[in-house]
Amino acid sequence: MFKIFKRLTAKELSMIVLAVIFVCLNVYLNLKIPDYMSDITTLLSTKGTKASDIFAWNTDAPGMRMLLMSFAGFMASVVVGFLAARTAASFTTRLRDDIFHQVLDFSDAEIKQFSIPSLLTRTTNDITQLQMVLTMGLQVITQGPIMAIWAITKIADKNGNWLLALLVAVAVIAILMLFLLIMVMPKQRLIQTLTDKLNSVTRESLTGIRVVRAYNAESYQEDKFEKANTDLTQNNLFIGRSFALLTPVMTAVSSGLTLAIYWIGAHLIEDVKIPTDPTKIAGAMEDKVHLFSDMVVYSSYAMQVVMGFMMMIVVFFLLPRAVVAAGRINEVLDTQSSVSYPENSSEKPKDVGTVEFDDVSFRYSETSEPVLEHVSFKAKKGDTVAFIGSTGSGKSTLVNLIPRFYDATQGTIKVDGVDVRHYDHETLHNIVGYIPQKAVLFSGNITSNMTMGTSNNSPLDDAKIWEALELAQGKDFVENKEGQLKAEVAQAGSNFSGGQKQRLAIARALARKPEILIFDDSFSALDYKTDRKLRQELSEKTQDMTKLIVAQRISTIMDADQILVLDQGKVVGQGTHKELLANNEVYQEVAYSQLSKEELENGK
């Protein structure tokens, strides 16, 4: 908890110190009010007192002083509220930025470690918990103990019976706080975990809504959601019911304490006997008035003590969630990406346009099975290298190692003759263009998606965008869109078909004119006609680009200069289409399951 507050800036710390000063000032002003109440009570009990003696437009009148103190206390509270809100907003805004930038630097391994729903909860709900505890902490949590302790010191030297009544009330409140600490705090710690689970189920159901409907699985998903929702609801109900005791118990304690103070005060006043000597009657009456005045003041101070403890109970409502939230946020901020980049590339390219794997192996964790084993090949500039194999054979994992979504656990991967680990982030991703299996578009328009990642040094004008769209076979449908390049793109490109999104993603990579293009099964959503035309265009117009293609269709890779056949993470065949068709059983099995013998023999 305290670790995360080390991220506070000097300005924010100074605002916190200033807020605490104003909290102390507010407590002081509030605790002065009972003194003026005592003066007013004494004046009201004195014969010949006029209204002007109690309230007048000068600072000598106790009523005016009481009014000024109340107004000053109100202004101090306003200042504390402003400083608390400003500090909390500033701190959490920066914290969100830090988490967002940290997550952007994560490799796929860290993303999977936390899960997307959990990262979303940490960035939103957890930070909101911290913002709330910081805001309330400066206004309430800080004020509570200061007020309680200060009020007790003000009345500690008064009548012992009154002090005993106050201590009994404090003991009851302490028992309530202990109950909340033991019973509620463990439940508070569960809230974020249960919220993560609910978010995960909701996100899963919404993203897969078509599949859910297609398989009539609504009741199954509803049951999953119902369980997650019920778990969270039951947890929150337990916390809510426990804190529901707070108001009636505190009301009973306050009322009981007030009653006890007045009951004790009545007996103390009654114990002051009126003497028979007329000259001493005035003194005895004055003693009774002083006792009555002390009783009123003590009652006010006692309520301040109770109020202080009530404020401290707020800690037990906010702090457990905030502690858990801070731990979860620190977990993200302290996690270093398994893929780190140097600030600047340490070597200059030696063999432009080449990609080389030298005895590369990869596993997702030290305890998991190898996904790739001893893969070696070299792609020369302008070559087309294809990867084919059964599902789970490691094709996508292999090409994902090139842009360093993961790092190889063994062996070396070179791009342009340089180990990929020696490139800085920007340089490597300027060399390599990547089109993923699932085309990803961002909300905005077509132009904003196409120019994504380009710098001012190499801007993309409309002519270059149209050129890339034409090459990717996307020009026709973009021209038919209202606004054309300015046509709206909804979140995740939901207003485009799968094939259209695929072509836009391909065009986005082509527009940057990288040295190396990676197609991670990027033709799967295209019809055969578009697929064939696109491959033909790529072959003719990107001869200087090295192309690495992961594919399921034999027809997509028949013209490749080199084909690697993968099976359970191992290269079991390497060569051209004709070579593999002649001597590789795995390739033959895949090929003959898709095309006829005549179609295959017409390949390269």
Predicted features and spans:
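An intracellular "coupling" helix at the cytosolic face of ABC transporter transmembrane type-1 domains
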Residues: 10, 108-109, 125-134, 138, ...
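Conserved catalytic Walker-motif region of ABC-type ATPase nucleotide-binding domains
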Residues: 103, 225, 329, 357-359
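Helix-loop-helix
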Residues: 150, 154-171, 238-327, 332-333
